[in-house]
Design a protein with these regions (language model features):
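Helicase P-loop NTPase motor core of nucleic-acid translocases
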Residues: 1-172
Length: 172
């Protein structure tokens, strides 16, 4: 974690990334929360907590550790790197050892699945419940009324006068 100004601690690096707008206040506080509830988590775990918070706020379901491993964190505009993410194997091992992290099925603030994806528990739970509901629907053999389906499609996508293929109708 060297910068042009010399060595900085991981906590200082997170603070600088917050000050420069890379992390939000929520990301920083969540990372600090994980550090506090674990009695001082490894800096790599605290970094992962801040990143999973950031990625979730940006609309992602999880943080893919493999895609972030070795990445340099900073803002492109300032040209400074404040932190480099650890290698995948080391990062995964440190995260898995943290008491704040559980495997799928556990109730912990963070969930690490078998594909190196780190989730906030709530989002892992949402994804799991949604997947189960979709699988259950696919497995039901309920008959559907094809005439009703055809009428609905005709109402939403009337036949084109030019004889062209209506790709929206086909997609629906």
């Amino acid at each position: 974690m060297n910068t042009e100004n010399g060595y900085i601690t991981p906590a200082d690096a997170l603070s600088r990334l917050f000050q420069n707008g890379f992390f939000s206040r929520l990301d920083l506080f969540f990372a600090r929360f994980i550090s506090e509830v674990t009695g001082g988590a490894a800096p790599e775990v605290v970094l992962a907590a801040a990143l999973v918070s950031k990625y979730t706020a940006a609309g992602h379901m999880c943080l893919n550790l493999a895609s972030m491993a070795g990445e340099q964190l900073g803002l492109p505009d300032d040209g400074q790197t404040f932190l480099t993410c650890p290698s995948l194997g080391r990062w995964r091992d440190l995260i898995a050892q943290s008491p704040a992290v559980g495997m799928p099925g556990a109730v912990r603030p963070l969930i690490l699945d078998g594909k190196d994806r780190l989730y906030l528990y709530r989002y892992w739970d949402y994804e799991t419940k949604l997947a189960r509901a979709l699988i259950a629907r696919v497995r039901t053999n309920e008959a559907f009324d094809t005439a009703l389906l055809r009428d609905g499609l005709n109402r939403l996508f009337p036949p084109a006068d030019d004889g062209e293929c209506d790709w929206q109708r086909i997609a629906a």
